[in-house]
């Protein structure tokens, strides 16, 4: 009964398109009616859509926050959802750049949770994998045979705290592996 409302920061993100497909299938398999909304990378659109969902019968709210790392925005959305006594899940995009601040937000409402990765650890793992791969395949990767590997680093959305950390720690750890060799 009711709808699970899922607010996406954008439908244009390729990775999130695959997440959306899998999430919708999993929720529908549990008999949940899912309403997906595209915020088009606009926080005001997302906020307005969530407020509309709250007054039109949503029974749960799932949020892929447009403004990654914006604790004030996350607090406002949390307050709106908690005022309706509904469960809320924030996912994929950090609600704050400060872990203690984010933890306090979720401890303040017992029907809330954040689902995401340990992005520092993800970056470390990615960096180690890249470093080890380069060591094992150096001759293949040194295309101009100058003893250096040229690369281009693609990073996700500039505001996404997870993408920022994965890039930072990925490069640092790859460098550590290669420097140690």
Residues covered by each model-derived region:
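A residue-level marker of the well-folded mature domains of exported/periplasmic proteins
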Residues: 1-181
């Amino acid at each position: 009964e009711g709808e699970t409302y899922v607010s996406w920061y954008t439908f244009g993100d390729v990775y999130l398109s695959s997440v959306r497909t899998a999430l919708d299938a999993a929720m529908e398999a549990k008999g949940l009616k899912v309403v997906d909304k595209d915020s088009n990378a606009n926080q005001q659109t997302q906020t307005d859509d969530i407020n509309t969902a709250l007054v039109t019968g949503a029974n749960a709210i799932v949020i892929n926050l447009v403004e990654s790392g914006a604790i004030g925005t996350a607090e406002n959305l949390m307050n709106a959802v908690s005022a309706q006594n509904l469960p809320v899940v924030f996912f994929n995009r950090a609600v704050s750049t400060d872990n203690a601040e984010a933890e306090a937000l979720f401890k303040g409402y017992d029907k809330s949770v954040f689902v995401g990765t340990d992005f520092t650890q993800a970056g470390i793992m990615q960096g180690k994998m890249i470093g080890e791969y380069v060591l094992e395949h150096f001759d293949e990767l040194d295309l101009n045979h100058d003893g250096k590997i040229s690369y281009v680093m693609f990073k996700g959305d500039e505001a996404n705290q997870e993408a920022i950390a994965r890039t930072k720690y990925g490069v640092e750890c790859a460098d550590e592996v290669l420097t140690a060799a």
